[in-house]
């Protein structure tokens, strides 16, 4: 084992938030606060931009009771960003600034909690620090409700979003069957290139049929076939519920839901949305049926009230493991998961090279999609069902959630 490196730790959060990203942060922060070799624990305010702007939060000055509420508090408590640092060979301005801040606060440990692009940031910083000879151990902590990080069995945040989607589909199904006239309901889920979230609608079918069709971005979308499938099911049942990913593409690669403004986020990804309403209008015109389009939108990633207990525990484990491994001398890794479902369900942490993870996407397996391309198989249900087990321990005050309230004391 490598000798424990003495110095401060920074943890940052990046990209879209989730219901359990703060559980990962808590695992990191609590473990770091209890480690004798870590002198200070800082939170990067709004991710890597907080480092660049010298805006670091003193986590050791927060009340313990408030920190203890972090695992059950949604969104990114430290603030997030969508800032993509350039390749240092092209422009090393940001890296020089990061090094300057690291030296100022004697930072020897850096954790970055995020998805694909965040792991790229992590990897670039790690390599730059090695290049300039500054000893700093870097670890990626996974976070993405899209569940598309390469290598790991699944990502913290996905299970809670999946649980919310499945629960919502079950509730919408009850509502849709109230009237004798029947209805077509189209539910839009997040997922730009990977269909893991939308597939979660299949979990709603375990007790009784709720979701009739599921359309994923891994399958080219055919509008005529979609209309025919839904129309036929509606004629048969006088009700039809469809789950569709925001990122379903036409055969030419263009998104069905791509915004006309061609707006993009900070990482250059097209901003999608509005697909449910578009498809609802088309179905209404073609069938004359009552049609409703529902966009789950941000609710998928912040519904802490029905978070998965398993997800919370595993998110905490990923943050805790990151610090433990860095103290042991490990660097330039992502803390992922290795799971066994052969006899029940077990999950343990597994380290992956950041270079093998950065900027790669894990697609939904083709073999888990039905031959018709409009649903998923039982293999997916067996994969996902263990992940959504267990309940949150979210504290309630006057019937409403009591989330963590951080003082956010900035380092000077």
Named regions from a protein language model:
Residues 258-412:
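C-terminal non-catalytic interaction/assembly regions of soluble proteins
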Residues 18-28, 51-52, 94-96, 116-124, ...:
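Short glycine/serine/threonine-rich phosphate/pyrophosphate-binding segments
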Residues 2-55:
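N-terminal phosphate-binding or glycine-rich loops at protein starts, especially the Walker A/P-loop
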Residues 2, 53-108, 117-118, 156, ...:
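Glycine-rich oxoanion-binding loops at beta->alpha junctions
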Residues 5-11, 70-84, 143-153, 180-183, ...:
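Gly-rich Lys/Arg/Thr-decorated short loops/hinges at beta-loop-alpha junctions or inter-strand turns
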Residues 101, 109-114, 120-135, 139, ...:
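Accessory alpha-helical/coil subdomains and C-terminal extensions
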Residues 14-16, 44-50, 82-83, 115-116, ...:
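Short, ordered loop/turn segments at secondary-structure junctions
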